[in-house]
C-alpha cells in the first residue's frame, strides 16, 4: 500500500515536471512568433516609407502618394483621386 502511494506521488511529480517544461517551450515559441511578426511589420513600414504612400498614408504633396491617389489638403493623407484607368 505504501509503495503504491509512493509511485503515485512520484508519477504526479514527474507529470508536473513535464508539463512545466512544455509550458516553458510554448512560451519561447510564442515569443519567437511575436518577434517575427514585429520584424515583418517594421519591414513593411520601412518599405512603405521608401516608396509611395498607400491609401490613408501620411503625405505633404500629391507626389508622395501612389498612383490614383492624391494628398488631401486638410488632413494630409492619401485619398483616391477618382480615376479608374490603369
Curated annotation (Swiss-Prot):
Pfam families from the UniProt entry: Toxin_12
Propeptide residue interval(s): 22-50
Cystine pairs: 52-66, 59-71, 65-78
Translocase among keywords: no
Keywords: Disulfide bond, Ion channel impairing toxin, Knottin, Secreted, Signal, Toxin
InterPro entries (alphabetical): Huwentoxin-1, Huwentoxin_CS1
Superkingdom of origin organism: Eukaryota
Tissue expression per record: Expressed by the venom gland.
Example of a GO MF term: toxin activity
Family: Belongs to the neurotoxin 10 (Hwtx-1) family. 17 (Hntx-9) subfamily.
Record's protein name: Omega-theraphotoxin-Hhn1a 3
Organism: Cyriopagopus hainanus
